[in-house]
Amino acid sequence: MGESHAPSKPKLDGELCLRPSSSVFLGDQQLYFTQEYLRTNSLNLKYVVYFTACQFSGPIAVAYSPRPASWYIWIRTISGRILKRDMAFNEPVFMEWTRAHCLLVLNKAGRAHIFSSLGEKISEVIFDSQMSDVHECRTFATSRGDSGIAVMDVDGQVSVVNSVSEPVIWSMKPPYSEMPTAWTAFQPHSQLTHILLIFEAVFLMGCQGESLREQSHAASWVDSNTKYVKCVVDDARSRIAMMTESGKIQIVSIDLSTCFCTVEITDHDIAKCINFGWVGNSAVFVQMSPSLIVFVNVSARRKPGDEVQIYEKMTANAKISIEPDGIRLFESTQVEFVEAASREKIAVLNRNPNEDGAHLYKAAQEMSQGTGHNSFAASTVIQDLYKAIDDCISTACDTWQPEEQKLLLKAARFGMAYTNTTPDTTKLMRAIKEIRVLNELRMVRTGIPLTHRQFRAIGETCVINRLIDMGSYSVAIKVAQWLGGETSENVDRVLLEWVRRSISKVSKSNMKMDQPALEALDEKISAKLLQFPHVSIADAARRAIEAKLPELARLFIRRETDDANHVAVLLQLNDVSAALQKASASQRPQLIHQVVRHLMNSESRSSYELAISRIPLAQCLYQDLVRQEGETRGASSRQMLALLEQASDFERQTLFHFDVAETERNPDERLNALRRAKDAAKSMGDKAIEEILNDVSAFAPLQIQRGQADMSVRDTVIEMAHDTAKVAQLKQQARLTDKQVLLWTIEGLAKKGKMEQLFDLAQKRSPIGYAPFVKACVRYKRLDEIKKYFAKVNGYPDLVAAHLAMKNYVEAAKLAYDRRDRDVLHAVHMKSHEDPTQCPRVGQFLRSLDQN
């Protein structure tokens, strides 16, 4: 490509398209074609070598090679706004966006570079040095919301990173010397990453830590007379679309056990396609060339022998990006989104006579045209008004044109006037907020044409994060205010990120930061922050400190009105004298305490006492602080106790004696401290604490006599469990309940190996069931005794507890499933993660219960 093909300063000439969407029926599916942007010549896709678009309507990245061995990557929004230009790169072979909004670029040698949406390098992943040159790559979504990457080299070895943000590399080598005809990588929900390799009609699958195994259970649907050339996992990670050399498309389950749909295309040689993927949940696309795309209905409702439903669309040098709810076509002069319409949208916009939403929409249209009698007539045939209102709101969220959105929202509001009860407007108000946000994001200046389904999938926090990543701070603040109000935490986050990036940009530049330059930056940032009174300027000062610009931080902090924040930043700057003066001027003792403690921790005693002596209030509070330090040793301890006794502060006296009892190693001194605490509590008049301390101080001497001063009551009962007389004595002394004694006795007998005594105890009717016997035997590895006590277990709660103690998670799950007890089943599922072999089976019970 010549230099003239990529102008150095391309202009943003995209235009938002507000034309109504067109649609076609594809069997039981209706595809909507929405032209999002027109005149997008600045995207300059004609000479692109590599193209990739971020999911959820994020930026695009294109790679040009104007000369041999010379590569440049540009990053733009979908509308054409440039985020990064002429980013040089050496021999890229693969580009893809991760779900974390990062661009991954892989070179021929197997080194993956991770960039932000502004082209800033974040990290890199170096695959095995023994790996040969890269042959192909696949990225896949993870359960954590991130992306993983699988790289196949020219020898067929697959190296995998489960998460690009936390790269740990593992690899898998197929048993055959030839290359697979199709392959993919995916991570089913709550499972390990799987690699699927297809060698003509032989399917091999394996996951981390396992070898590749042939999937013989797929034989029921595999066409062994041809070879499979494409396989693509859907966004839900529950199905795979397969393509054969003979023109057959099959939709199969993720574990390859079931084939849901088979379609055979005879009009096109689809095996020679250049792209293949999903369009929503029930259709796929086959890109035959840059100028032809074939859409195919693969709905599970199709029956064998049904006519194949396809739609051919001519395009102009189209590049395709796949979204969770459709695909986006980037053509020479426009950007178009293709989606399978929702049930509500089909019902309302197609004026279906059997749908209440269509009647309500028609009534609103008649009303807007001034024909009220027709409007009333249309509204009288509505059977379920609430469903009609919901359908109109849902359709308004799914449409692109503001006029149509307004009319649909008016229809919903019109319907609310006819409801028998006071309408709940929560859903309508939320829809209005979200539509306002979506319309702003779709503007050319922002260039994020999110659909409502995409917005709901990623959430408002993720949208704001993406705007921050792209440097669109003003739009991010608007969105945060519209969705969360003026004082939204997201507004603070956007502002502080703008501050951080503004300061970081200056600190990393080579420009000299003299006083006038610092004052100009302070004026710029402070002027913006002062528009939002709830945002602290002290946070900007902290960002300046982190960027090693202390003088800028001092300029910021002059404007801070909160004394606590002002003092905290001055301490971070280690300007203790200024912090002390500010704290003293505020007349707030807690701030002076904060500064004094900082001095005591960071300076020598002579230094901080000299600084404190200059400020009378600080000196007074320092003396009080020394008295309250409460050091439980030497003269300070005696002085503290004397002060407390002089002040008749019985509450603090009690706490003081508690501290002594906790730290004292001598049992006699500990007992004396407890008795003094009891006396102080009595003087305080707190009967509850006095009674507790009375019991403790009565029990403690007996513990000392037995040489068990350091043992708790529980440990003592367990230790003496075989001696029923001593256990009875302990029960009386410590005022224990029958249940406590029985539980601890069972544990003690199992621990000591007193199996005959334990069996005699079990012969009596147990008020706490027999699960504790099983638990104790399992805990202390009395394996020969477990079955004996398990046979006595009865009742649902006891059986579940016993199975859990024995780590029989599947059996426990069966009991909970039979009772339809979701809470217990969920608890069993959480515990079953200890055993990877049982966890999937328990998970099946939980999912089955949720589906029912």
From Swiss-Prot:
Keywords: Endosome, Lysosome, Membrane, Protein transport, Transport. The keyword Metal-binding does not apply. GO terms for biological process: digestive tract development; embryo development ending in birth or egg hatching; endosomal transport; intracellular protein transport; regulation of vacuole fusion, non-autophagic; vacuole fusion, non-autophagic; vesicle tethering. GO terms for molecular function: actin binding. It is a peripheral membrane protein. Its main location: membrane. GO terms for cellular component: CORVET complex; early endosome membrane; endosome; HOPS complex; late endosome membrane; lysosomal membrane. Disruption phenotype: Viable with a reduced number of gut granules in the adult intestine. Embryos of these adults arrest in early development and lack gut granules. Endosome/lysosome fusion defects in coelomocytes. RNAi-mediated knockdown results in a reduced number of gut granules in embryonic intestinal cells. RNAi-mediated knockdown results in defective endosome maturation with the accumulation of small vesicles near the gut lumen and large endosomes/lysosomes on the basal side of the cell. InterPro entries: VPS16, Vps16_C, Vps16_N. It is found in: Late endosome membrane; Lysosome membrane. Pfam families: Vps16_C, Vps16_N. Probable core component of at least two putative endosomal tethering complexes, the homotypic fusion and vacuole protein sorting (HOPS) complex and the class C core vacuole/endosome tethering (CORVET) complex. Their common core is composed of the class C Vps proteins vps-11, vps-16 and vps-18, which in HOPS further associates with vps-33.1, vps-39 and vps-41 and in CORVET with vps-8 and vps-33.2. Belongs to the VPS16 family. Plays a role in vesicle-mediated protein trafficking to lysosomal compartments including the endocytic membrane transport pathways. Believed to act as a core component of the putative HOPS and CORVET endosomal tethering complexes which are proposed to be involved in the rab-5-to-rab-7 endosome conversion probably implicating sand-1, and via binding SNAREs and SNARE complexes to mediate tethering and docking events during SNARE-mediated membrane fusion. This is Vacuolar protein sorting-associated protein 16 homolog.
